[in-house]
A protein has these predicted regions:
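Structured loop/turn residues at beta-strand edges in well-structured enzyme cores
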Residues: 32, 104, 128, 136-139
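Surface-exposed beta-strand-turn/loop segments characteristic
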Residues: 73, 77, 90, 116-132, ...
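Short, solvent-exposed loop/turn elements at domain surfaces
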Residues: 45-49, 109-111, 182-185
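Extracytoplasmic beta-strand/coil segments of soluble accessory domains associated
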Residues: 72, 76-117
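Soluble periplasmic/extracytoplasmic beta-strand elements of cell-envelope proteins
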Residues: 35-40, 54-59, 64, 74, ...
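Short, basic and Ser/Thr-rich N-terminal targeting/leader segments
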Residues: 33, 95-97, 105, 315, ...
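Extracellular/periplasmic catalytic domains that process cell-envelope and extracellular macromolecules
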Residues: 31-32, 103-105, 166-167, 222-223
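N-terminal Sec signal peptide and the immediately downstream disordered periplasmic leader
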Residues: 1-66, 73-76, 214, 218-220, ...
Length: 439
């Protein structure tokens, strides 16, 4: 009985082990026939289900539902995408639109159209200009943020953004889109700050109007072996300034108790020697010089004149096509032209504590000048020299004593409000053409 139990257990273990061994295919199995094998260096061809790297896709349905006019707005909805250069950038603008994955820099983000690299958009940067990509032509967007540099090189350290355009389109489409920005500007906190500083309150505004027209047409060959697609888009977008929003109508200063302020380099003078008039003096609009007290209107509100949104006029024209020459060879082409005009406005230029020299007998320093009123601050008291005893003597006292004129120095800070804001205009024109055979 004991021997029988051992034999039964042995057969049971053997059967269990055999069931876990892998099966092998022998000669009687049918061979698998592969019609086509495609080897590619791009991991973007894999779906987000089978891809071995993180892949995010934005489809045509989501793109159309958002109604965006600019292609950078298509991907800006993702948390790992930062838009470095857009129409909202004024100070430091390049007149282009660039993408920045994971905040590692736009020069480390590779941008492709149908797997082909985009050219850079500015002579001062190697970053790709996505203004060349018309939003209406985008079928989907593939974004890879890991392992891309192993395939594409160091310019893909942050990742790859691949815009897949519409293929084999047949028919005619015309789209027109109009948008505007309306804001009630009813932020109570900002209204109080603007009121305390006696700054302009914009009230309700409608600004930043934008129009977008696009045409898309395509035709397939009669034999079904080829297609030609043409497209054209025109965009016209108006400017929007900081003063058009209550949150931008003044420059906020202070962290714990903010107040409307700005730059103090605004019609200021400083003496540079001895014990002249203490501190800084400010020139009122009527020319009178008064002590600088930090009054709100003694600061220059540079935020109000900066662009919130730059004006943009853009043309995109292009054509693409393909034709199967044989079962294994296909000819294709892709051409795109883009012309983009924009302007970036920032605050007036300024002299920041710039020294200048003059003589003590300068009429600006002596009596009789309207700035030297009896109740105000006199420039002649702000600077001077030292006598033989080492005591300070102002220019006015020095000249009143019958001495010869001497050279003196001032520190001046001034905003060039007379010359108007600084405006930089940009015009970028790019033509891209690709021809080839594939099979």
């Amino acid at each position: 009985m004991k021997s029988f139990n051992k034999s039964y257990l042995s057969h049971a273990v053997a059967a269990a082990v055999a069931s876990t061994l892998p099966g092998f295919a022998f000669a009687q199995d049918e061979e698998a026939n592969l019609e086509e094998v495609v080897v590619t260096g791009s991991r973007l061809t894999k779906s987000n289900v089978t891809s071995s790297v993180p892949l995010v896709q934005i489809g045509a349905e989501e793109i159309n539902s958002r109604g965006v006019a600019r292609v950078e707005d298509v991907v800006n909805i993702l948390p790992n995408v930062f838009v470095s250069q857009t129409a909202e950038v004024a100070n430091g603008a390049s007149g282009t639109s660039t993408l920045n994955l994971r905040g590692l820099g736009s020069q480390r983000t590779l941008v492709l159209i149908d797997g082909k690299r985009l050219p850079f958009g500015s002579p001062f940067s190697s970053s790709a200009n996505v203004d060349m990509v018309p939003a209406r032509m985008v079928e989907r967007v593939d974004i890879v943020t890991s392992g891309a540099s192993a395939v594409y090189g160091s310019d893909a350290v942050a990742g790859v953004v691949n815009f897949i355009t519409k293929k084999d389109f047949e028919g005619f489409e015309f789209d027109y889109q109009y948008s505007t920005n309306y804001n009630k500007n009813s932020n109570g906190y900002m209204e109080n700050l603007l009121g305390e500083a006696d700054f302009f309150d914009p009230g309700s505004t409608t600004t930043g109007e934008a129009s977008l027209m696009s045409v898309l047409m395509g035709v397939n060959s009669d034999d079904g072996r080829g297609n030609i697609t043409l497209f054209g888009t025109y965009e016209d977008m108006e400017e929007m300034l900081g003063k058009d929003r209550d949150t931008g109508a003044c420059t906020l200063f202070g962290s714990s108790d903010p107040f409307c302020g700005g730059s103090s380099n605004f019609r200021r003078f400083n003496g540079t020697i001895g014990n002249g008039v203490a501190g800084t003096v400010f020139q009122e609009l009527n020319g009178e010089l008064v002590p600088f007290t930090g009054r709100s209107d003694m600061y220059y509100n540079y935020g109000a004149v900066n662009h919130y949104q730059r004006p943009v006029e853009r043309w995109n024209l292009g054509a693409s096509g393909h034709y199967e020459l044989t079962e294994n060879v296909e000819a294709y082409f892709d051409t795109t032209y883009m012309n983009n005009k924009t302007a970036a406005q920032i605050a007036e230029s300024a002299s920041f504590n710039r020294p200048f020299f003059t003589n003590c007998d300068n009429p600006l320093l002596l009596g009789g000048n309207p700035n030297n009123n009896p109740d105000g601050v006199r420039l002649g008291d702000m600077t001077g020299t030292f006598d033989a005893n080492g005591d300070f003597v102002s220019c006015l006292d020095w000249m009143a004593a019958g001495n010869e004129s001497i050279d003196v120095q001032f520190i001046n800070s001034h905003r060039n409000v007379e010359g108007g804001p600084r405006v930089s205009t940009y015009e970028n024109s790019t033509w891209r053409a690709i021809f080839g055979l594939r099979g």
